[in-house]
């Protein structure tokens, strides 16, 4: 391919609304152009990267035994009403009507459609297991689209759905997909981690996320450097930091703490370590009738409540922060001075594991301007319900017992779920077993953010000059940069010959035959992220030499013209082997 026959649209400046590196570089490199908030045109080079990503995904999904199909982007509301998600999903679900006033939606995911397909097409256990996948456009009406394609509204996604006879079959399908995903991201040349995750709104019993490691990642990943343990912050287990509870050494006392409504200020006033304080948070869970049920959640003063874990406290699935009226009724004190001692008997006290093992701790006194010191379980207040409700922090003991945890940032690019029978039972998706009895199909679902992978790869691989693509994702593998293509017949002939030979060898090469200054030409391809560059000019040809340079090399090499083809092929193959 020649640059004059392609479409290069590089820019010197990034758009003013670009917040992250990937957004800035994708626009400047001519990969995308914004058409509306969270919606982008993919220019030829951007689409080429997408196609390379799709090809890797298809190859590994097919190798894992999955079967490709294509489901509609527009889906009828009736299917989503069967599972209750039509009502449950918020404004992220883009609902539309046709000319007959019938309700439809633009799919954000396809569990309902694939389950409908399976219930109509699969009858017998002999047809199971089966795993369908598609690569399709999705739409989620994000309230605030940001970070370019990383959190856009329209995006491309690979979603797969497995159907099995039983849970044991699901576990096998899940493991097969986990291994396929691992191979997909390895082939893409990305540094990534698979982490334990919460299933969230999609439901099911177990899931793992795949994160590309990047300092700019939205998600915190808790991992153990000494083992394979990894989980996202929402799901990471937090063990007690004190294995046993110490003996009480202080008498409980009420002390004045005027205008001190947070643990840090209280600890400073009382000249105590922050780790000796306890934070009290009051939540309310509305009931079908009668007053809301109240919960007081306790975490150590230097820790943060994990809201996902809190939502799993029995009775707190649908909860909210208590109102001022509810706080006054339960504690007779304003927020900032709440504590578990002397609260209404109607309040359920839930202590984090670390708090449950604390002695002589400090907490709110349920009296404005006062806190309690020397508080001890069993003596000053009843034993609490003990659960893991906090966020993990650096230095926590690893849940697998193999050291302590660290925390890094990551960008979620894949997620695998064990859905179970949530959708099949809701939609009557059954098969006849060997005894002729109807059984619900056991489902798994597996997603990869195709377009999101582009942004994640750039967040991980870039420098001050532009994008540093893994070889398997790069829009081109090699660029040939002539010094005077139209002015020198020897240069033109050498460039054309090398281009044709590399094409014949299966190398993805582009010959930049534009009438551009060398500096501008080099800057464009460093911005775009071509992994390898060959420079051919009259000066080098006089000595039968050309320049060869890798994108991350500090200096170029002089290579004999007769050897450059093999040098390029060898370098490209070595780069591919490094990520295979």
From Swiss-Prot:
It is an enzyme of class 6 (ligase). The keyword Aminoacyl-tRNA synthetase applies. Its EC number is 6.1.1.15. It is found in: Cytoplasm. Keywords: Aminoacyl-tRNA synthetase, ATP-binding, Cytoplasm, Ligase, Nucleotide-binding, Protein biosynthesis. It comes from the Bacteria. InterPro entries: aa-tRNA-synt_IIb (IPR002314), aa-tRNA-synth_II (IPR006195), aa-tRNA-synth_II/BPL/LPL (IPR045864), Anticodon-bd (IPR004154), Anticodon-bd_dom_sf (IPR036621), Pro-tRNA-ligase_IIa (IPR002316), Pro-tRNA-synth_IIa_bac-type (IPR004500), Pro-tRNA-Synthase_IIa_type1 (IPR023717). One of its GO terms (cellular component) is cytosol. The keyword Hydrolase does not apply. It catalyses: tRNA(Pro) + L-proline + ATP = L-prolyl-tRNA(Pro) + AMP + diphosphate. Gene3D superfamilies: Anticodon-binding domain (3.40.50.800), Bira Bifunctional Protein, Domain 2 (3.30.930.10), YbaK/aminoacyl-tRNA synthetase-associated domain (3.90.960.10). PROSITE patterns: AA_TRNA_LIGASE_II. One of its GO terms (biological process) is prolyl-tRNA aminoacylation. SUPFAM superfamilies: Class II aaRS ABD-related, Class II aaRS and biotin synthetases, YbaK/ProRS associated domain. Its main location: cytoplasm. One of its GO terms (molecular function) is proline-tRNA ligase activity. HAMAP family: Pro_tRNA_synth_type1 (MF_01569). Consists of three domains: the N-terminal catalytic domain, the editing domain and the C-terminal anticodon-binding domain. Homodimer. Catalyzes the attachment of proline to tRNA(Pro) in a two-step reaction: proline is first activated by ATP to form Pro-AMP and then transferred to the acceptor end of tRNA(Pro). As ProRS can inadvertently accommodate and process non-cognate amino acids such as alanine and cysteine, to avoid such errors it has two additional distinct editing activities against alanine. One activity is designated as 'pretransfer' editing and involves the tRNA(Pro)-independent hydrolysis of activated Ala-AMP. Belongs to the class-II aminoacyl-tRNA synthetase family. ProS type 1 subfamily. This is Proline--tRNA ligase. It comes from Polynucleobacter asymbioticus (strain DSM 18221 / CIP 109841 / QLW-P1DMWA-1) (Polynucleobacter necessarius subsp. asymbioticus). The gene is proS.
């Amino acid at each position: 391919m020649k640059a004059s026959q392609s479409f290069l649209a590089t820019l010197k400046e990034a758009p003013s609304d670009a917040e992250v590196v990937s957004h800035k570089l994708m626009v400047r490199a001519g990969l995308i152009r914004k058409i509306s908030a969270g919606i982008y045109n993919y220019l030829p080079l951007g689409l080429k990267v997408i196609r390379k990503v799709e090809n890797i995904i298809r190859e590994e999904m097919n190798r894992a035994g999955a079967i490709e199909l294509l489901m509609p982007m527009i889906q009828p509301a009736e299917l989503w009403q069967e599972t209750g998600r039509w009502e449950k999903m918020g404004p992220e679900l883009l609902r539309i009507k046709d000319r007959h006033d019938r309700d439809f939606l633009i799919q954000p995911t396809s569990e309902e459609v694939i389950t409908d397909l399976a219930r109509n097409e699969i009858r017998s256990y002999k047809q199971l297991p089966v795993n369908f996948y598609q690569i399709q456009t999705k739409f989620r009406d994000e309230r605030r689209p940001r970070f370019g394609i990383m959190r856009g509204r329209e995006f491309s996604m690979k979603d797969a759905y497995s159907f099995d006879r039983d849970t044991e079959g699901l576990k096998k399908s899940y493991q097969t997909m986990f291994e396929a995903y691992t191979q997909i991201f390895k082939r893409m040349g990305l540094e990534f981690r698979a982490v334990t995750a919460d299933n969230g709104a999609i439901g099911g019993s177990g899931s793992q996320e795949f994160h590309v490691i990047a300092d700019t990642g939205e998600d915190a990943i808790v991992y153990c450097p000494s083992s394979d343990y990894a989980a996202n912050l929402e799901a990471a287990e937090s063990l007690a930091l004190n294995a046993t509870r110490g003996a009480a050494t202080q008498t409980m006392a009420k002390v004045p703490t005027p205008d001190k409504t947070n643990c840090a200020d209280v600890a400073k006033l009382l000249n105590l370590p922050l780790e000796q304080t306890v934070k009290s948070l009051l939540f309310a869970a509305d009931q079908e009738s009668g007053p809301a049920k109240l919960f007081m959640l306790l975490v150590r003063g230097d820790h943060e409540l994990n809201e996902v874990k809190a939502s799993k406290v029995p009775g707190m699935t649908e909860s909210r922060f208590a109102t001022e009226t509810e706080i006054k009724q339960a504690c007779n004190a304003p927020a900032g001075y709440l504590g578990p001692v002397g609260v209404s008997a109607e309040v359920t006290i839930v202590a984090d594991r670390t708090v449950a093992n604390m002695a002589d701790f400090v907490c709110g006194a349920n009296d404005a301007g006062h806190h309690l010191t020397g508080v001890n379980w069993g003596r000053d207040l009843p034993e609490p319900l003990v659960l893991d409700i906090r966020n993990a922090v650096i230095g926590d003991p690893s849940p697998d017992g193999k050291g302590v945890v660290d925390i890094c940032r990551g960008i979620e690019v894949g997620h695998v779920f064990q859905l179970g029978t949530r959708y099949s039972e809701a939609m009557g998706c059954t098969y006849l077993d060997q005894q002729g009895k109807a059984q619900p199909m056991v489902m798994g679902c597996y997603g990869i953010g195709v377009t999101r992978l582009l942004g994640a790869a750039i967040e991980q691989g870039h420098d001050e000059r532009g994008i540093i693509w893994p070889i398997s994702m790069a829009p081109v593998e090699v660029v040939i940069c002539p010094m005077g293509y139209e002015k020198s017949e020897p240069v033109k002939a050498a460039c054309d010959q090398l281009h044709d030979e590399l094409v014949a060898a299966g190398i993805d090469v582009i010959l930049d035959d534009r009438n551009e200054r060398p500096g501008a030409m080099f800057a464009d391809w460093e911005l775009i992220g071509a992994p390898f560059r060959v420079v051919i000019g009259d000066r080098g040809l006089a000595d039968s030499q050309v320049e060869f340079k890798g994108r991350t090399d500090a200096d170029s090499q002089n290579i004999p013209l007769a050897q450059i083809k093999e040098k390029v092929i060898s370098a490209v193959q070595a780069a591919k082997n490094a990520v295979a």
